[in-house]
Curated annotation (Swiss-Prot):
Protein name according to UniProt: GDP-fucose protein O-fucosyltransferase 4
Gene Ontology CC: one annotated term: Golgi membrane
Family statement drawn from the similarity comment of this UniProt entry: Belongs to the glycosyltransferase 10 family.
GO biological process: fucosylation; N-glycan fucosylation; positive regulation of protein secretion
Membrane topology: Single-pass type II membrane protein
Transmembrane portions of the chain: 8-24
Protein's job: Protein O-fucosyltransferase that specifically catalyzes O-fucosylation of serine or threonine residues in EMI domains of target proteins, such as MMRN1, MMRN2 and EMID1. Attaches fucose through an O-glycosidic linkage. O-fucosylation of EMI domain-containing proteins may be required for facilitating protein folding and secretion. Also shows minor alpha-(1,3)-fucosyltransferase activity toward activity toward biantennary N-glycan acceptors. However, this was tested with a library of synthetic substrates and this activity is unsure in vivo.
Reaction catalysed by this enzyme: L-threonyl-[protein] + GDP-beta-L-fucose = 3-O-(alpha-L-fucosyl)-L-threonyl-[protein] + GDP + H(+); L-seryl-[protein] + GDP-beta-L-fucose = 3-O-(alpha-L-fucosyl)-L-seryl-[protein] + GDP + H(+)
Species: Rattus norvegicus (Rat)
The enzyme's E.C. designation: 2.4.1.221, 2.4.1.-
Stretches assigned to the Cytoplasmic side: 1-7
């Protein structure tokens, strides 16, 4: 991921500093679709000696903490941020952090990798490139993954061999070690914001506005949403802004800036509030992957017409607050239902009942918002970057204690078994067409050429890096040889 993306992440989280970053290299060998075989782990306990996950932890930071390098930090475990440009501290290359179980030193100095005190490497998923992974993998170090962004940024992590390279995870999945499924939802109050009066929206309809809004400038994505919207437009008016399927110009120059479309700019929010229904379609389909495309319409009092996380019902404020595209057998049937709601105010308002006092009845959602230890623009809580960092710190402190206990009594206290991430920590299936069947799409279709190949190449790359670690390889330059060998073995019968 280029430097501007990591800077944007830090800025959005309110981190004080952003160190300069260089662009990470991409990878692009082609691959053909083939099922992911049952994966037998090719390593044994000697290859990995990291750890078991420990429960939720807190994070506090003392402003007067001494700088790393003196007697108070010399024996502390080191956490090394490996991704360029992502280091949530200011200033310098290292900082002592105070967490629930004790202190660690966070660093971005890659020279520390070989130091026995360096207990964990922290990777940002979008930046992680198997071809550039630090080799050989050192037996005493955990690998920790932060990947709250779209799976399209790195499909290696959507396969078992890729995600199981890591010991600790912070992803959008509720099943990850440090889950971030509600990263785009500040709190329940965000959902309770009053909706505009229906008479105002009726006036916009009389002025020629469609009932349904589509605002996208990221086209040709793995979810193939534009293909579905194009078909839906045959049956119901859709006002499409942005670069994808555009049929209307935003009313002001400011709103024509695509950078504004992902913000909560007051002018943008007022404009979007004119619409009763918003097409809310994620760029990729994974359980628990939900973004502002879902939450922003609800904040504005519009009804999301949603395709994205298959588990989205688990997170809704009640059982009648979103229209799910996949509940309808065709775009035509969906269009007919939206048209019905558009003409029946009483039925439409049932979708906004969660905004009334006591209207949020989903206790699972409320509990997750209340008990998460990180916050969204909350000065009383750490952001999830620092929160995950402390989670890793406490994990490594506990692992050190377990190792010491085993050394003191090896017959009575067994070696701590390594904790390995599972496929459920991402849970992203192979991309499918937004409309129609994959076999009906021409082979030269841009979606088919790009995303199916990218998805399956992620599998090959994860298998290649796993094999290199198992073989204790030290030369990154051999990576593509491994990929080629795996590709040939998988496709030898084609």
């Amino acid at each position: 991921m280029a430097a501007r993306y990591t800077e944007a992440v830090l800025a959005a989280l309110g981190v004080l500093s952003v160190c300069s970053a260089s662009s990470s290299s991409g990878s692009g060998a082609s691959g053909k679709a083939g099922g992911e075989a049952e994966w037998a782990e090719p390593w044994d306990g000697a290859v990995f000696r990291p750890p078991a996950a420990l429960g939720a932890v807190g994070m506090t930071r003392g402003l007067g903490s001494p700088p790393p390098g003196n007697a108070e930090t010399v024996d502390l475990p080191v956490l090394l941020w490996w991704s360029p440009g992502l280091f949530p501290h200011f200033p310098g290359d290292s900082e002592r952090i105070e967490c629930a179980l004790g202190a660690c030193v966070a660093s971005r100095d890659r020279r520390a990798r070989a130091d026995p005190r360096t207990r964990a490497l922290l990777f940002y998923g979008t930046d992680f490139r198997a071809a550039d992974a630090p080799l050989p993998r050192l037996a005493h170090q955990s690998w920790a993954l932060l990947h709250e962004e779209s799976p399209l940024n790195n499909f290696l992590l959507s396969h078992g061999p890729g995600i199981r390279l890591f010991n600790l995870t912070a992803t959008f999945s509720r099943h990850s070690d440090y889950p971030l499924p509600l990263q785009w939802l500040p709190g329940a109050a965000y959902l309770r914001r009053p909706a505009p009066p229906l008479r105002e929206r009726a006036e916009w309809r009389r002025r020629g506005y469609a009932p349904l809004l589509y605002l996208q400038s990221h086209c040709d994505v793995p979810s193939d949403r534009d293909r579905y919207v194009r078909e839906l437009m045959r049956y119901i008016p859709v006002d499409s802004y942005g670069k994808c399927l555009q049929n209307r110009e935003p009313p002001t120059v400011r709103l024509q800036d695509t950078a504004t479309a992902t913000t909560e700019d007051p002018e943008l929010m007022a404009f979007l509030s004119r619409y009763k229904f918003h097409l809310a379609m994620e760029n990729a389909i994974c359980n628990d992957y939900m973004t502002e495309k879902l939450w922003r319409p609800m904040h504005l009092g519009a009804v999301p017409v949603y395709r994205g996380s298959p588990s989205v019902r688990d997170w809704m404020p009640n059982n009648h607050s979103v229209i799910l595209i996949d509940d309808f057998e065709s775009p035509q049937k969906l269009a007919e239902f939206i048209d019905f709601l558009d003409k029946n105010d009483e039925e439409y308002m049932k979708y906004l009942a969660y905004k009334q006092p006591g209207g949020i009845t989903n206790q699972f959602l409320l509990d997750n918002l209340e008990h998460r230890e990180w916050g969204v623009n909350d000065p009383m809580l750490p952001n999830y970057l620092n929160g995950f960092e402390c989670f890793v710190c406490d994990h490594e402190l506990a692992r050190l204690d377990a190792e010491k206990a085993h050394e003191s009594s090896p017959r009575d206290i067994p070696v701590l078994e390594p904790h390995i991430a599972q496929l459920s920590h991402m849970d992203c299936p192979v991309p499918t067409p937004g409309f129609g069947k994959v076999e009906e799409i021409p082979e030269n279709d841009s979606w088919k050429e790009m995303w199916l190949q990218d998805y399956w190449q992620g599998l090959y790359q994860g298998e290649a890096l796993t094999a290199m670690i198992h073989n204790n390889e030290t030369q990154q330059s051999k990576f593509w040889d491994y990929v080629h060998e795996i590709f040939m073995k998988r496709n030898k019968n084609l």
